UniProtKB/Swiss-Prot annotation:
The lineage of its organism: Eukaryota, Metazoa, Chordata, Craniata, Vertebrata. InterPro entries: FN3_dom, FN3_sf, Ig-like_fold, Type1_Cytokine_Rcpt_Type2. Disruption phenotype: Mice do not develop dermatitis upon Il31 overexpression. Decreased levels of immature myeloid progenitor cells in bone marrow and spleen but normal numbers of circulating blood cells. The keyword Repeat applies. Heterodimer with OSMR. Interacts with JAK1 and STAT3. This is Interleukin-31 receptor subunit alpha.
Length: 716
């Protein structure tokens, strides 16, 4: 019992672990004519050891052929595959775990037949623009109908043109070629019912026969007319687009005449492809022909308009764009009758049209293409299209284009204007065209606050300024501008600016408020002064004390007031008043000193007492001894200090003068022996002065009389 269970378990495990081979699928067969029938299938490679048994049934099912194969491919011998038989193929895959058969596939041998490349026997030019090709297959086709394909190209071209020949014989005629042009040819073929072409034959190179030159493409460059209306016309010509590359030309003939004249001018045997004419102001007709050994070409005619003639405009719009690897120009014509166009292009930086100008004639289309490699990269070209109706040339339509764009060589030069509290205007200059390397699509303004996030704003290519808003007050910003083309952008130099802390409006507002307040205060003050003048007048115009009513006037008596009033009436130029020395007695000096000291004591005492009524001193001419001037020792004469009189004001000067005169008169009456009085010490200079006398006398000068006795001088 247990033995049977173990046997069943091992059998089930072995069955569950068995891996059958993959079923062969996608069987494909090719009948290599006169060689074998080769079939392949999938999978191409197994993970374990797998072998195949291939079975072929042929002769319309009458015969079988089987064989072993170790790979997913097998070639049946030629004896088993003879067209137009129909065969069937079956593949069985087997390994140690089992067998798997494929589905049976059926094959019509002629439909899967493939031949070897044909052999080109000869290529002969016939007439002017035709080749006759003779060829043969490598196998014996046994009369099965064939289809041929011939491909050809010119030597300097990489574009092949293919031509099919149904019910192809072993001779093919290739027509529609260009005269005197070198071509490269190749041939292949297949059975009419087959799906497989043979490989291309070996390439053959031949040249078509020569013929007379083709008509030329003719163009002109018109120079400005001089004062007489004469102008230079440069004629340009070249082979027409599509003309034979190997076309031989010996020379050119030029003919031209004025439209209002029958006088024909001819210029023969020109070997260059340009010529300069000097024509008068009227319209002319110009023709150019080329010639070789077989004859001359047709005339290329062009009309040169009158100097004052207005040309017509037949182009409504035009655009240029890049379609790798070409530059394409399209335009729209307003008149369908125009079918010929002249396209001009030259670099914008060219100093003159010739020789930098390139041109080309276009017919039957309204577009023009040129390979990008034939134009300079990063260079702006002026492209103009001229409509040609008959022999008349119309008004051109011009645009600019780049064959290849790059990033600008440098960024814009940037400035900051109109800086406000939260706004600023960024301006920049256009980049020179020589540094653009393409069309500027837009400008991007980048700005960043100090320690803040970088922000940007984009404007179109026509804008040269940008207003920044929502900035922060009193903040430093860094700003730069990037100019972008189709290829990328280039940043300009970074600059810094700082927003304002206070705006002009705020300054005006603050000034207006302060000014308005001051104006209101002034108005209120004036109004108050007009209403109550007694209160305002003492504040604005305080009373000035009258020196005549001071304590000095009280001390000197009524004589001072009268004298003061008298001197006031006789006012004069105080600057001319000078105290002059005069003959005086010998003791006059001492009396003057004593009298003046008494005067100073009285004034100082009144100032200190603030209104005391007691007045020191006696009469004006009394000789007293000043407390501040003690008597000197006997036997010594009076020392002579100098007194400087300064004229400061009319009243103070006249007062002091009168005092001196009165003192002098009093002393003159006394005996001359008074000069022998004991000397007095000089007055103290540091004593405070009366404020009413500070402008009249600032220093004192003592005058010594010339008649002082000799013994007094000796004592001094």
């Amino acid at each position: 019992m247990w033995t049977l269970a173990l046997w069943a378990f091992s059998f089930l495990c072995k069955f569950s672990l068995a891996v059958l081979p993959t079923k062969p699928e996608n069987i494909s067969c090719v009948f290599y004519f006169d060689r074998n029938l080769t079939c392949t299938w999938r999978p191409e490679k197994e993970t374990n050891d797998t072998s195949y048994i291939v079975t072929l049934t042929y002769s319309y099912g009458k015969s079988n052929y089987s064989d072993n194969a170790t790979e997913a491919s097998y070639s049946f011998p030629r004896s088993c595959a003879m067209p137009p038989d129909i065969c069937s193929v079956e593949v069985q895959a087997q390994n140690g775990d089992g067998k798997v058969k494929s589905d049976i596939t059926y094959w019509h041998l002629i439909s899967i037949a493939k031949t070897e490349p044909p052999i080109i026997l000869s290529v002969n030019p016939i007439c002017n623009r035709m080749f006759q090709i003779q060829w043969k297959p490598r196998e014996k086709t046994r009369g099965f109908p064939l289809v041929c394909m011939l491909r050809f190209r010119t030597v300097n071209s990489s574009h092949w043109t293919e031509v099919n020949f149904e019910n192809c014989k072993q001779v093919c005629n290739l027509t529609g070629l260009q005269a005197f042009t070198e071509y490269v040819l190749a041939l292949r073929f297949r059975f009419n019912d087959s799906r497989y072409w043979s490989k291309w034959s070996k390439e053959e190179t031949r040249v078509t026969m020569e013929e007379v030159p083709h008509v030329l493409d003719l163009w002109r460059i018109l120079e400005p007319a001089d004062m007489n209306g004469d102008r230079k016309v440069r004629l340009l010509w070249k082979k027409a687009r599509g003309a034979p590359v190997l076309e031989k030309t010996f020379g050119y003939h030029i003919q031209y005449f004025a439209e209002n004249s029958t006088n024909l001018t001819e210029i023969n045997n020109i070997t260059t492809q340009q010529y300069e004419l000097l024509l008068m102001s009227q319209a002319h007709s110009v023709s150019v022909t080329s010639f070789n050994s077989l004859g001359k070409s047709q005339e290329a005619i062009l009309r040169i308009p009158d100097v004052h003639e207005k040309t017509f405009q037949y182009i409504k719009s035009m655009k240029a764009y890049i379609a790798e690897p070409l530059l394409v120009v399209n335009w729209q014509s307003s008149i369908p009758a125009v079918d010929t166009w002249i396209v001009e292009w030259l670099p914008e930086a060219a100093m003159s049209k010739f020789p930098a100008l390139s041109w080309e004639s276009v017919s039957q289309v309204t577009n023009w293409t040129i390979e990008q490699d034939k134009l300079k990269p990063f260079t702006c070209y002026n492209i103009s299209v001229y409509p040609v109706l008959g022999h008349r040339v119309g008004e051109p339509y011009s645009i600019q284009a780049y064959a290849k764009e790059g990033t600008p060589l440098k960024g814009p030069e940037t400035r900051v204007e109109n800086i406000g509290l939260r706004t600023a205007t960024i301006t920049w200059k256009e980049i020179p065209k020589s540094a653009r390397n393409g069309f500027i699509n837009n400008y991007t303004v980048f700005y960043q606050a100090e320690g803040g996030k970088e922000l940007s704003k984009t404007v179109n290519s026509h804008a040269l300024q940008c207003d920044l808003e929502s900035l922060t007050r009193r903040t430093s910003y860094t700003v730069w501008v990037m100019a972008s083309t189709r290829a990328g952008g280039t940043n300009g130099v970074r600059i810094n600016f700082k927003t304002l802390s206070i705006s002009v409006f705020e300054i005006v507002l603050l000034t207006s408020l302060v000014g308005g307040g001051l104006l209101l205060l002034s108005i209120k003050t004036v109004t108050f002064g007009l209403r109550k003048p007694n209160r305002l007048t003492p504040l604005c115009c305080p009373d000035v004390p009258n020196p005549a009513e001071s304590s000095l006037a009280t001390w000197l008596g009524d004589g001072f007031k009268k004298s003061n009033m008298k001197e006031t009436g006789n006012s004069g130029d105080t600057e001319d008043v000078v105290l002059k020395p005069c003959p005086v007695p010998a003791d006059l000096i001492d009396k003057l000193v004593v009298n003046f000291e008494n005067f100073l004591e009285v004034v100082l005492t009144e100032e200190a007492g603030k209104g005391q009524a007691s007045i020191l001193g006696g009469e004006a001419n009394e000789y007293v001894t000043s407390p501040s001037r003690p008597d000197g020792p006997p036997g010594k004469s009076f020392k002579e200090p100098s007194v400087l009189t300064e004229v400061a004001s009319e009243d103070s000067h006249s007062t002091c003068s009168r005092m001196a005169d009165e003192a002098y008169s009093e002393l003159a009456r006394q005996p001359s022996s008074s000069c022998q009085s004991p000397g007095l010490s000089p007055p103290r200079e540091d004593q405070a002065q009366n404020p009413y006398l500070k402008n009249s006398v600032t220093t004192r000068e003592f005058l010594v009389h010339e008649n002082i006795p000799e013994h007094s001088k000796g004592e001094v």
